[in-house]
Regions:
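Flavin-dependent oxidoreductase catalytic cores
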Residues: 1-139
């Protein structure tokens, strides 16, 4: 059985992925999971708005240990312009993968039109994804 796999050009050594969980996947927990063999570490979702406001708590969420790699960072929001701007502003950070949260079911997130709310209509996230993909540094 082949254990190694890839997302784009990022090699992941095994199939064990630490899911992004708000309030759980802080730096200490991620280190512990990496020590226990996680192949890909996913940070908890980070608000594009909070990054744009230079929120101190958000800065702490984005801290990455050099031993965590490969590591994925997850943005959430619903404003294509802002998300593209934030993606560009953080491209020098040491994460290997950047993704958009489209699955969070928490009412506080969904009621703001973020997370799984991006999937409520048939193709509501297509324009957001297309816009973001074209303007992100990784297209």
């Amino acid at each position: 059985m082949k254990m190694q796999w890839k997302i784009g050009n990022v090699e992941i050594p095994n199939p064990f992925v630490l899911a992004p969980m708000a309030g759980v996947t802080d730096l200490a927990f991620r280190r512990l999971c990496k020590e226990q063999g996680a192949g890909l570490i996913c940070m908890e979702m980070v608000s594009a708005k909070a990054i744009s406001f230079h929120n101190k708590n958000t800065e702490a969420l984005m801290e990455i240990d050099p031993g965590e790699h490969p590591v994925s960072m997850q943005l959430f929001g619903n404003e294509p312009d802002l998300m593209a701007e934030v993606a560009k502003s953080i491209e020098e950070r040491p994460f290997d993968i950047l993704d958009i949260n489209m699955g969070c079911p928490v009412p506080k997130v969904v009621n703001n039109g973020e997370g799984s709310a991006l999937l409520k209509d048939r193709f509501p996230s297509a324009p957001l994804y297309s816009y973001y993909e074209k303007r992100s540094p990784w297209h």
